[in-house]
């Protein structure tokens, strides 16, 4: 487990700063956000310090979503499992420009009980240029072929 001495989340993991811990595994720590945007807003963090998602080892990342899934069950989010029912957002930001405040990878689990609560998202979609999209697709497939055999 890599940690950083001045990182607030690393201090929470070590117990140097108190938290409202919910689930802890060998590689993941989850707790209630102390500045929530909705009731039961939870943070889920890897126990490996890294500022951005690509800095976290895969074995730590693969532990996170099962914890998120368990939390959705405990929080009883959309128990009836219908598109019309309440829902939730799972949010993860990388870098200041993408609204990351703490330089330790973290996932927000934000309940969305109704239109007035939880995360509000505006999605400014662009018009689709299919020729441009096709060229990007080919370029990305070439890049993916190069990294398929590399350790990500």
UniProtKB/Swiss-Prot annotation:
SS bond list: none
The UniProt record lists the keyword Hydrolase: yes
Cofactor(s) required for function per UniProt: Mg(2+)
GO MF annotations, alphabetized: hydrolase activity; nucleotide binding
Induction data: Expression is decreased at the stationary phase. Expression in suppressed in the presence of Pseudomonas aeruginosa lipopolysaccharide (LPS).
InterPro entries (UniProt xref): HINT (IPR039384), Histidine_triad_CS (IPR019808), Histidine_triad_HIT (IPR001310), HIT-like (IPR011146), HIT-like_sf (IPR036265)
Residues the entry annotates as binding AMP: 33-34, 93, 99-101, 106-108
EC number(s) on file: 3.-.-.-
GO biological process per UniProt: nucleotide metabolic process
Functional note: Hydrolyzes adenosine 5'-monophosphoramidate substrates such as AMP-morpholidate, AMP-N-alanine methyl ester, AMP-alpha-acetyl lysine methyl ester and AMP-NH2.
Name listed for the protein in its UniProt record: Adenosine 5'-monophosphoramidase HNT1
Native source organism of the sequence: Candida albicans (strain SC5314 / ATCC MYA-2876) (Yeast)
């Amino acid at each position: 487990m890599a940690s950083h001495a001045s990182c607030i989340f690393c201090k929470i993991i070590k117990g140097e700063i108190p938290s409202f811990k919910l689930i802890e595994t060998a590689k993941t720590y989850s707790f209630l956000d102390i500045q929530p945007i909705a009731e039961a807003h939870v943070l889920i963090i890897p126990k490996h310090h890294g500022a951005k998602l690509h800095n976290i080892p895969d074995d730590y990342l693969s532990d996170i979503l099962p914890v998120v899934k368990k939390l959705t069950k405990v929080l009883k989010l959309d128990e009836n499992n219908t598109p019309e029912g309440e829902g939730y957002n799972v949010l993860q930001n990388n870098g200041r420009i993408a609204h990351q405040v703490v330089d330790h990878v973290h996932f927000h689990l934000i309940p969305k009980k109704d239109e007035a609560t939880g995360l509000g998202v505006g999605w400014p979609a662009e018009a689709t240029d299919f020729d441009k999209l096709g060229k990007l697709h080919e370029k990305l497939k070439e890049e993916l072929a190069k990294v398929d055999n590399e350790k990500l």
